[in-house]
Amino acid sequence: MSSPLADEPVEPADEGAEPLTDDEYAEYLAELGPVWEVVDDHHLEATYEFDDFADALAFTNEIGELAEAEGHHPDLHLSWGEVGVEMWSHDIGGLHESDFVMAARMDRIYDGDGGD
C-alpha cells in the first residue's frame, strides 16, 4: 500500500524558500519505501530492482511520464534490472516536500498501486 504522501500535490518551492532541515525531512522520509535514503542532506536516492531490462525500462518511462505531468524531474539511471533515482529541488539546492511526494508516487508506480 502506498503512502498518503503520494496523494499530495507537487508544488514548486516558493521563491526564497530554504531546503528542508533534517528534522523536517525525517518525517517525510519515514513515509517512503525502504529503498529511499537522504544523501548529504541534499537529495533523495533510491534503487529499484527488476527482473530484466524491459521491466526497468518500462518503469523508467512511467517515471518520465509522471515527471513531465508534474514538471518536476528526477535524475534517472537505467541499467539491466535496476533504475536509480536521484530527486531534489534544483531551485532551492536541496530537498522540498514535493521531492518526497514524487518519491512516494514512484513507490506507488513500482508497487503497482496506480501508476496510470
Swiss-Prot record:
Per the record, where are the segments of Acidic residues compositional bias? 8-21
> Could you tell me the Gene Ontology terms of the biological process aspect for this record?
tetrahydrobiopterin biosynthetic process
Q: Where do the segments described as Disordered lie? A: 1-21
Q: Which domain of life is it from?
A: Archaea
Which key words are in the record? Lyase
EC numbers, comma separated: 4.2.1.96
Q: What is the lineage of its organism?
A: Archaea, Methanobacteriati, Methanobacteriota, Stenosarchaea group, Halobacteria
Any one GO molecular-function label of the UniProt entry: 4-alpha-hydroxytetrahydrobiopterin dehydratase activity
Reactions catalysed, semicolon-separated, are: (4aS,6R)-4a-hydroxy-L-erythro-5,6,7,8-tetrahydrobiopterin = (6R)-L-erythro-6,7-dihydrobiopterin + H2O
**Identification of the protein by name:** Putative pterin-4-alpha-carbinolamine dehydratase
Annotated family: Belongs to the pterin-4-alpha-carbinolamine dehydratase family.
InterPro entries, per this entry?
Answer: PCD_sf (IPR036428), Pterin-4-alpha-carb_dehyd (IPR050376), Pterin_deHydtase (IPR001533)
